[in-house]
Structures are given as structure tokens and as C-alpha cells.
Swiss-Prot record:
Pathway: Amino-acid biosynthesis; L-isoleucine biosynthesis; L-isoleucine from 2-oxobutanoate: step 2/4; Amino-acid biosynthesis; L-valine biosynthesis; L-valine from pyruvate: step 2/4. InterPro entries: 6-PGluconate_DH-like_C_sf (IPR008927), KARI (IPR013023), KARI_C (IPR000506), KARI_N (IPR013116), KARI_prok (IPR014359), NAD(P)-bd_dom_sf (IPR036291). Residues 1-181 form the KARI N-terminal Rossmann domain. The gene is ilvC. SUPFAM superfamilies: 6-phosphogluconate dehydrogenase C-terminal domain-like, NAD(P)-binding Rossmann-fold domains. It comes from Chlorobium phaeovibrioides (strain DSM 265 / 1930) (Prosthecochloris vibrioformis (strain DSM 265)). The active site is at residue 107. It catalyses: (2R)-2,3-dihydroxy-3-methylbutanoate + NADP(+) = (2S)-2-acetolactate + NADPH + H(+); (2R,3R)-2,3-dihydroxy-3-methylpentanoate + NADP(+) = (S)-2-ethyl-2-hydroxy-3-oxobutanoate + NADPH + H(+). Keywords: Amino-acid biosynthesis, Branched-chain amino acid biosynthesis, Magnesium, Metal-binding, NADP, Oxidoreductase. This is Ketol-acid reductoisomerase (NADP(+)). It holds the Pfam family KARI_N.
Length: 330
């Protein structure tokens, strides 16, 4: 894979252009502020009733309606929730874009699954920082940055890649490294990771471990500590130095037990199910299911949210976290 750094990116490809950042959430505030402080001309596009309008103005940013921001802009970054992007694109973005403009995303869902099909007359690019927005912002203010992915879906002007690199540089990402990929690969790996490992697999593993201990007669508090609370200690070791760092840092007892018992949990049958989940991402079945869920009023999602919030691990967890001064919000 191609990796680019500061010397490979030129902010000149965005200087003198009008840049609209649509949305001012976790990623939106980081993109808007970092680019502004990199010397670029940035406005934020929001709904008139958005609670974020006041926050963006307080940060020194000019705020317009989404339609007006797009009409003004040469480059538009869409940082709105996936499920709202198509409707807003159809009603407020597409009618106000001109040939030669650039449409940018931080995740490829709507482009890859053809919910949004831009005309061939505009650039379509992706710049995806591989960290939450608060870390994108914090590292920038510290003079550093986080790694970013870029992808070029369509180059109408001959400058799409240079603009994507310039955007990543404006975020601070070129100091860490900018990896070139495709919309397809970013979207499919991102969704699979969320479903099979990060949000789905890990949560179900935690609940199953907690339930196993409680059903065997152990106190819920001990089950919570062993299966939920201490997971952060292990994940931090993974994050800092990979599997080897974790194995080096834990006791020999933990290392041996993990290496000999872990494969009994993640069996070939589990991996086969992972492959099925990946296939549903690849062939669009998950995307269709999610879009139908959104259009149907989130009935299944709301039911699942209620079930998860009522799990015993949530009750005991809330009680134990109140004992942890470093977690108690002031």
C-alpha cells in the first residue's frame, strides 16, 4: 500500500478554495478546526435547529445552512450520520454542487453501496482519520496527527488525489502517515471489524463470560471485574504493542491459559461465521438490512438497545463504576 507523509502533500491544492464541513460532531469539529488552523477557508454546514450551531460559532467558525454552505463551497466534506446522508445529498447537496467541485467523505458506506451516486463532473474522495474526532483534534493541537486513509473514487479535475492528500495534511495526518486505499476496501473492512470484533464480537464475548461466572455461582461484582473492567488493561497493551506486548506484560499463568484455552473459544466454526458476516457486508445484504431498518423506524434496533441496557452487567457495572473516582464525572 502507498503511504504518504508531509513532503508528499501540498496544502496549496486547497488554499484559495472554499471548504464546507457538513456536521459538527466528533469528526466534524476536528476537521473544521484543524483545517481552519491550517490556514484554509472553512465554513460549517448545519441544520438551522442544530444544537451544534452555537458550539461551532463559539469556536470561531462561520455557520451556514447545509444548502448555503454547499452552494458557497468548492470542496464539501460530508460528516453526517450514514443513514441521513442520502436524503440530505438528494435535497441539499446535489442541487447546489457545480462541475469541478469536490465531494468528500470520511467513510465510504453511501458511495460503495450506491445510495449516493454523484455525477462524473465532480471529484469524489475519502479522507478517513483512524481515530475518534477528539484524538484527531488533540494530536493536532499538540503538533502531531493520527494516521489517515485516503481513497479516490472519481477524479474529474485531475487533482482529486492531491486534494485528498492536502486535506489529510491539514488534519495533521500526514505527520503520522496517509495510507491510500479504495472506497470498497475501507467500507467493507470497517463494517466487518465493527460487527465481528469491535462492537459485536467483543460485546457478546464479555456478556457470555459474565453470564458463565454468574450462572456458576460467582458474585456479579467479580464477574464484572474479570470480564468487563479488566478488558481495558489488555486492550491498552494490544493498542500499544500488539499481541506480543500483551503476552510479555501478563503473568506466565495468564499467557499460558490464554494461548491454550483461547483457541477453544474461537474455533473454526466461529471463523466460518465470521466469513458469513463478511459475505453479508461484501454482497450488500447488511447495507440493505440497515437501510430498511432505518426506513422502518429502528424497531429492531430499539428492541436490541432495550435488551442490552437491561442486561445484569449494566446494573452491576453502573454500581461499581461509582466506586472509581477517576470515572466519576464532575
Amino acid at each position: 500500500m502507498n503511504v504518504y507523509y508531509e513532503q508528499d502533500a501540498d496544502l496549496g491544492y486547497l488554499q484559495g478554495k472554499n471548504i464546507a464541513v457538513l456536521g459538527y460532531g466528533s469528526q466534524g469539529h476536528a476537521h473544521a478546526l484543524n483545517l481552519k488552523e491550517s490556514g484554509l477557508n472553512v465554513r460549517v454546514g448545519l441544520r438551522t435547529d442544530s444544537a451544534s450551531c452555537q458550539k461551532a460559532r463559539a469556536a470561531g467558525l462561520q455557520v451556514d445552512t447545509i444548502a448555503d454552505a454547499v452552494k458557497w463551497a468548492d470542496v464539501v466534506m460530508v460528516l453526517l450520520p450514514d443513514q441521513y446522508q442520502k436524503a440530505i445529498y438528494d435535497s441539499e447537496i446535489a442541487p447546489n454542487m457545480e462541475p469541478g467541485n469536490t465531494l468528500a467523505f470520511a467513510h465510504g458506506f453511501n458511495i460503495h453501496y450506491k445510495q449516493i451516486v454523484p455525477p462524473d463532473t465532480i471529484n469524489v474522495i475519502m479522507i478517513a482519520p483512524k481515530s475518534p474526532g477528539h484524538l484527531v483534534r488533540r494530536t493536532f493541537t499538540e503538533g502531531n496527527g493520527v494516521p489517515c486513509l485516503i481513497a479516490i473514487h472519481h477524479d474529474a479535475t485531475g487533482e482529486a488525489k492531491q486534494q485528498a492528500l492536502a486535506w489529510a495534511k491539514g488534519l495533521g495526518g500526514a505527520k503520522a502517515g496517509v495510507i491510500e486505499t479504495t472506497i470498497k476496501n475501507e467500507t467493507e473492512t470497517d463494517l466487518f471489524g465493527e460487527q465481528a470484533v469491535l462492537c459485536g464480537g467483543s460485546a457478546e464475548l464479555i456478556k457470555a463470560g459474565f453470564e458463565t461466572l454468574v450462572e456458576a455461582g460467582y458474585p456479579e461484582e467479580l464477574a464484572y471485574f474479570e470480564c468487563m473492567h479488566e478488558l481495558k488493561l489488555i486492550v491498552d497493551l494490544f493498542y500499544e504493542g500488539g499481541l506480543s506486548r500483551m503476552n510479555y506484560s501478563v503473568s506466565d499463568t495468564a499467557e499460558y491459559g490464554g494461548m491454550t484455552r483461547g483457541p477453544r473459544l474461537i474455533t473454526p466454526a466461529v471463523k466460518a461465521e465470521m466469513k458469513k458476516i463478511l459475505e453479508e457486508v461484501q454482497d450488500g445484504r447488511f447495507a440493505k438490512e440497515f437501510i430498511d431498518e432505518c426506513n422502518g423506524g429502528y424497531k429492531n434496533l430499539n428492541r436490541l438497545r432495550k435488551e442490552n441496557s437491561s442486561h445484569p452487567i449494566e446494573t452491576v457495572g453502573a454500581k461499581l463504576r461509582n466506586m472509581m473516582s477517576w470515572l466519576i464525572k464532575k
